[in-house]
UniProtKB/Swiss-Prot annotation:
One annotated GO molecular function: hydrolase activity
Domain HIT, first and last residues per copy: 3-109
Annotated motif Histidine triad motif, positions: 94-98
InterPro entries: HINT, Histidine_triad_CS, Histidine_triad_HIT, HIT-like, HIT-like_sf
Protein name per UniProt: Uncharacterized HIT-like protein MJ0866
GO CC annotations, alphabetized: cytoplasm
Any Pfam family: HIT
């Protein structure tokens, strides 16, 4: 059983900020910023694209409700981050979104790396092929 399933089942304690029948949202134990929260679906799915549409809708609604709760922290903006697969940085194989509140002057910057030289026409051809 994964660590998030253990948290959902109450086997591991967590600082819960929001919960409904579909999602659990709790403070990240290694926060990037004040209020950094993880939102997880209560049903176990490893990747975002594996979730059935109805579960996905409920999950996204839970993410939005979590943001509403976190607004009490008075942040100036926020990042929502989701990694799918090991090479993308996913460390726990249970779908989860990071909500990272942002505060003016906090020094946290989410940037993409070096721009890759990619032929967009070739990529589109491969996708549609």
């Amino acid at each position: 059983m994964c660590i998030f399933c253990k948290i959902i089942n109450g086997e591991i304690p967590a600082k819960v900020v929001y919960e409904d029948e579909h999602v659990l949202a709790f403070l990240d134990i290694n926060p990037r910023n004040k209020g950094h929260t993880l939102v997880v679906p209560k049903k176990h799915y490893e990747r975002f694209d594996e979730m059935p549409d109805d579960e996905l809708c409920n999950f996204i609604k839970g993410v939005k409700k979590t943001v509403e709760v976190l607004k009490k922290l008075g942040f100036d903006g926020y990042n929502i981050v989701n990694n799918n697969g090991r090479v993308a940085g996913q460390e726990v194989n249970h779908v989860h979104f990071h909500i990272i509140p942002r505060y003016e002057g906090d020094g946290e910057v989410v940037k993409f790396g070096e721009v890759k030289n990619v032929d967009l026409d070739e990529v589109l051809k491969e996708i549609k092929g």
